[in-house]
Amino acid sequence: MQHDNTPETVASMPSWETLEGFARHGVQQLLQQVLEEEVEQLLGRRKSERRSAVDPQRGYRNGYGKPRQLALTNGTIVLRRPRVRGLEERFESRLLPLFRRRTQEVGTLLPELYLHGLAERDFDLALRGLLGDGAPLSAASIARLKAAWQAEYEVWNSRPVNDLEVVYLWVDGIYVKAGLEKDKAALLTVIAGLQDGRKVVLAVTSGHRESVEGWSAILRDLKARGLTTPKLVVGDGNLGIWGALANVFPEAKEQRCWNHRLMNVLDQVPKKQQAQARQLLTKIPYAETQELAEKRKRDFQAWCRKRHLEAAAKRLDDDWERMLTFYGFPQEHWLHLRTTNVVESPFAVVRLRTTAAKRYRKVANATAVIWKTLRIAERSFRRLNAPELLAEVANGANYSNGVRVKATQERVPA
């Protein structure tokens, strides 16, 4: 078979630079053809054929509607919808419903682009670049998205959670400027580590970070919806969660966040000495045993006292026993249990979004948008290491310095 390699043919072939436009044009032609075939099947005849004199089928073509733009994930195309008259019911294409201006895939893409830290003016620019200058988008489309997120959030916030086998909880609050309030509102957030190794967003509710009552309300609500007692809760020492935990889940063990503690201690050290102090401090939570962590703590405090930094030495002592709780859990899980990074990492995306949160007049609107952001981030949450050990932890296995303590097989004689 010979190929036509004439200059005219070669010039008409798409290049890498024009490939997307070539593909869009092909899709546009194909979809226009499908629209025509829909009408042919409905009327039982081709565009140029006359109606049969024997039992003619009702209905006839009546030109085309106005050109319609349809946003696809690879750009925007223009289609002409055939019009049909003389039918008892209005003809509506299954391929292109009357008011549909974008595909379902683009509908899914819109909230993700909007939520990934784009201000509204940049959001519009980004979509124009992706979907083409003719993309049919409007402020009303974004408003409908926000309303849909609010409705989704309300359903999600009342869902049963009894099917979740929760082992660990990470808790924290993020402050956002929302509404007309003078003070920033906090979004109290709970992320759960499950027996299968997944991490999931469990609760996102507005409230005060240090409020025992606010955290108690969250825990009571989760308990009423089926949450069982977690084995360990990780959070900042200043949170009201600890008083709430004593009220609702007193059996749960507590781990204070090392990131917050190190920052608090360094605040008591002059800037010119912080580099050396940080080097000594960061070694403490990475000690292989609790005993070594205790020694490194004493070494740091001795370093502080030589430099008359009593406040820093004392700050490290605060709530010390709850800084070491993670040693009573599998060593494979320590990476996850030392800090609240599990919450703070996805909030890095949230903070991009909340730089513009002051335009939200209501805290509820900010809550819904941030919740949606976290739910998107949840898809890429890192799974817990050694998930096979989570069932042991859930069943009450004891660990010392990260190693499981075997139950005594023989009873000691009385």
Feature-to-residue mapping (PLM):
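Conserved beta-strand -> loop -> alpha-helix junction used to position metal-binding or nucleic-acid-contacting
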Residues: 232-239, 244-280
